Design a protein with these regions (language model features):
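C-terminal substrate/ligand-recognition segments
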Residues: 347-361, 365, 380-402
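Extended, compositionally biased alpha-helical segments that mediate assembly or anchoring
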Residues: 485-552
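Short, solvent-exposed, charged loop/turn and helix-capping segments
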Residues: 364-378, 426-441
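Catalytic-core regions of glycoside hydrolase
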Residues: 1-25, 29-308, 313-315, 320-324, ...
Length: 552
């Protein structure tokens, strides 16, 4: 069936659907089997039904003008070409002047409503993350998008993400108040609501439109302690007090790319709307310790004082996309610092504070064995401490190589690799930190061996190379969604660093080894199908105590 094949060439695979829906790419990770669509429809209906039972209004994807990049050739449509995203061809944008805009958007909403009913909110993000708007009348485009949505539900609200230039000001400035709700996506770091101190400040904020104060916090689902506690609290109360922004502020939101990390920060952002007056991080953390562990304990209070004053309190002016990344997960290099291309991470805390927090947690670990929240945090804090140690050791390796000191190089590189294996062992005690949990979830979505293999490949690629060679290397996407997890540490990150150290050892021996092709090494793992268990191994407290004693 020609049409089905063409549709499948357009829709992205399960690991990359989010980027397809944001107009960043098409087709990558697919083609999907028919059972995938059936399964997703069934799941979506369950989610929407349950949301409505709870009185939650779902935000469904609205029509943003997206059509396949070859829609001009295939369908004769009048389109604008938004260009490329990290080497992927973006879908084209259907010009509002094309008479078929109305027809296609109406068809889209008709089918959507047939499946999931009408809603009061539709998510629409044209030209997300740098798409070219050349040749597009933005005012007309905004009005056409709004008109199409309103035909489906006259009371519906367009929901847009404020990220970089999206939504473009000319597209929204003439829309009626109340028709648009903007998610200020990165409020704790790069707010656009009108804060003059922000590098992404929009003069006049969002004008007449309502907006939501959102914490982004996590990029790529990366693992690592991180937060901007003071900036998050202060930013919210500053916005509330602002003459203009305070009038149009509608609430708070969470917009992370990956969840199941840094639970303390989600607790904190959700506290904001309930507290009329500004409060301090210190006073809030006192209550948090009891809420988190069900006990009052001086050592645990000290842990959170150290973390709250340090790694969880990145200053507002330190622009950083997510966590302080673990060097274990980096594509190797002598002066490697950040793992993903756009992390922009900065030194803003004392690593010794993290190690001291880990020591305190280990000191009371016997007392709280079996306390689930404590054991999760014990692993997470000790994981961060090991990553700090790894960063120091990697610098020793580099210094020894540059000094031509073979003995120190050999010792330091072996110690670094051993730290990766200890990290792997520690994380294996919790299912949340196991690559097996991730792969098992992906495989379980498939009905046949072929489907399971496709979904596993999507899952493996997303957390390693992310794309093909061009997207990974020139596009910068490799390691974007890296995971400091059990299984992948041992088999992927260890392998990569060992290959690099072997290469450097040859150089120290005066040989001229062939340059390493990292992508080839990485791609091999994405094609493997070796089993990873999701079942925790070892006693968390015993393993954590032993590792701490050995390393620190």
């Amino acid at each position: 069936d020609v049409y089905k094949r063409q549709i499948n060439e357009f829709v992205a695979g399960p690991g990359f659907t989010a980027w397809w829906l944001m107009n960043n790419l098409e087709g990558w990770g697919g083609p999907n089997p028919e059972s995938w669509y059936t399964r997703q429809e069934k799941l979506q209906k369950k989610i929407v039904k349950r949301m409505r039972e709870y009185g939650i209004e779902p935000v469904l994807p609205g029509y943003c003008g997206m059509v396949p990049h070859n829609a001009k050739e295939k369908l004769g449509l009048n389109v604008a070409d938004p260009g490329f995203w990290c080497s992927y061809h973006r879908p084209a944008f259907l010009q509002p002047e094309d008479e078929r805009f109305e027809e296609i958007s109406a068809l889209y909403y008709r089918e959507l409503t047939k499946l999931y009913g009408k809603t009061g909110f539709y998510a629409i993000d044209p030209f997300h993350e740098g798409g070219s708007t050349q040749g597009v009348n933005l005012d007309a485009a905004g009005k056409a998008i709004m008109k199409a949505m309103k035909k489906t539900n006259p009371d519906a609200v367009w929901v847009a993400q404020a990220w970089q230039d999206n939504p473009r000001t000319p597209m929204i400035e003439h829309l009626e108040a109340g028709d648009l709700l903007v998610l200020d996506l990165h409020s704790e770091c790069r707010p656009q609501w009108g804060d003059p101190a922000s590098e992404w400040c929009r003069k006049g904020g969002y004008g007449q439109h309502g907006w939501v104060y959102c914490m982004l916090l996590n990029f790529g689902g990366n693992i690592g302690l991180h937060g901007k506690m003071d900036a998050l609290i202060d930013g919210f109360y500053d916005a509330k007090a602002d003459v203009h922004a305070g009038r149009t502020l509608r609430g708070v939101g969470m917009t992370p790319e990956g969840i199941e990390n840094n639970p303390v920060m989600y607790e904190l952002v959700m506290e904001l709307p309930w507290r009329e007056h500004r409060f301090t991080r210190d006073e809030w953390l006192k209550g948090y310790v009891y809420a988190r562990y069900g006990v009052e304990d001086e050592a645990l209070q000290q842990v959170w004082d150290l973390l709250g004053n340090g790694i969880y309190n990145s200053p507002k002016e330190k622009i950083q996309q997510g966590t302080h990344e673990s060097v274990f997960c980096a594509r190797p290099g002598l002066d490697v610092y950040q793992v993903s291309s756009w992390s922009e991470m900065k030194e803003y805390y004392n690593p010794q504070d993290v190690i001291e927090a880990a020591r305190l947690m280990v000191s009371v670990a016997d007392k709280y064995q079996g306390n689930n929240n404590f054991e999760f945090d014990l692993v997470d804090v000790l994981r961060q401490a090991l990553a700090e140690k790894g960063r120091l050791m990697q610098k020793v390796v580099t210094a020894a190589f540059r000094a031509g000191d073979k003995q120190v190089f050999e010792l330091a590189s072996q110690h670094f690799l051993h730290l990766i294996l200890l990290q792997d062992q520690l994380l294996g005690t919790r299912k949340e930190f196991k690559v097996g949990t991730w792969i098992e979830a992906a495989r379980s979505a498939g009905q046949t061996q072929e489907e399971k293999a496709l979904y596993e490949w999507n899952a493996r690629v997303q957390i390693t190379t992310w794309g093909n060679r061009v997207a990974a290397d020139q596009g910068g996407l490799r390691d974007y969604a890296h995971k400091e997890w059990n299984g992948i540490l041992k088999d992927f990150y260890f392998m990569r660093w060992k290959a690099y150290f072997d290469y450097l050892a040859c150089v120290l021996d005066g040989k001229q080894p062939e340059e390493l092709d990292f992508y080839t090494l990485e791609e091999a793992w994405t094609k493997e199908t070796g089993f990873y268990s999701s079942i925790p191994e070892g006693n968390t407290v015993v393993v954590a105590k032993n590792i701490f004693e050995e390393v620190f």
